[in-house]
From Swiss-Prot:
GO terms for cellular component: nucleosome; nucleus. The lineage of its organism: Eukaryota, Metazoa, Ecdysozoa, Arthropoda, Hexapoda. This is Histone H1-I. Residues 1-55, 115-233 are annotated as: Disordered. Residues 128-137, 146-155 have a biased composition (Basic and acidic residues). GO terms for molecular function: DNA binding; structural constituent of chromatin. It comes from Glyptotendipes barbipes. Residues 17-29 have a biased composition (Low complexity). Residues 51-125 form the H15 domain. Belongs to the histone H1/H5 family.
Length: 233
């Protein structure tokens, strides 16, 4: 009897799990839209450079060139622009009407007939030229005149100060009047001086009377002679 060898269980190796794919970060909807737009955007066409001048300049040129006495209608202006500038007139028509309305209000264009953007239009007559250099010196002259008048007014306003001088002049006049009085007073003593001169004449006359005392001296002996007569009694 043969013994059977014990079976050895070999561990079964598990197959390695397949690596899970890395999760890609979720794209935001905004970025996704931008990416789509970037991919779908086509190169922009450059803006067409206008081959004609501004509407205002074209309309003014049309009115000056046509120069109709009764004014030019919008239809005539359109024809002129098409013939001269070769423009798509239907696209420019709203701008033409807008310019005409504004120019009429500002006085840049005269509306002969109609109202608004309908009717006929023409350019206003040229304004008369005024010689500005001639008018400018006149203004300067007026300014100088006003300055001179102001200075004269200031001088007139300052004239009340001499009134004080007049008041001071009055005492001077009184002094002048007092001086003649003093002269008169001085003249009076001058009149007295002749009297003083006359007094020496009187004094000179007095010595003539001096011989009289000499006559009186001889009379004294007569009295002395009389005294002895009394003793005889």
């Amino acid at each position: 009897m043969s013994d059977s060898a014990p079976e050895i269980e070999t561990p079964v190796e598990e197959a390695p799990k397949a690596a899970s794919p890395a999760k890609s970060p979720a794209k935001s909807p905004g970025r996704a839209k931008k990416a789509k737009k970037d991919g779908s955007d086509k190169p922009k066409k450059p803006k067409a450079i206008p081959t004609h001048p501004p509407v205002s300049e074209m309309v003014v040129n049309a009115l000056k060139t046509l120069n109709e006495k009764g004014g030019s209608s919008v239809i005539a202006i359109k024809k002129f622009l098409v013939a001269t500038y070769k423009v798509e007139i239907e696209k420019l028509l709203p701008f033409i009407k807008k310019f005409l309305k504004g120019a009429v209000l500002k006085g840049e264009v005269l509306q002969v007939k109609g109202t608004g953007a309908s009717g006929s239009f023409k350019m206003p007559p040229p304004a008369k030229k005024v010689d500005r250099p001639e008018s400018a010196p006149k203004k300067k002259a007026t300014k100088t005149k006003t300055r001179v008048e102001r200075k004269e007014k200031k001088v007139v306003a300052k004239k009340p100060k001499p009134a004080v001088e007049k008041k001071a002049a009055k005492p001077a006049a009184k002094k002048a009047a007092a001086k003649p009085a003093a002269k008169k007073a001085a003249a009076k003593p001058a009149a007295k001086k002749p009297a003083a001169k006359a007094s020496p004449k009187k004094a000179a006359a007095k010595p003539k009377a001096k011989p009289t005392p000499k006559k009186s001296t001889p009379a004294k002996p007569k009295a002395a002679a009389r005294k002895p007569a009394k003793k005889s009694k």
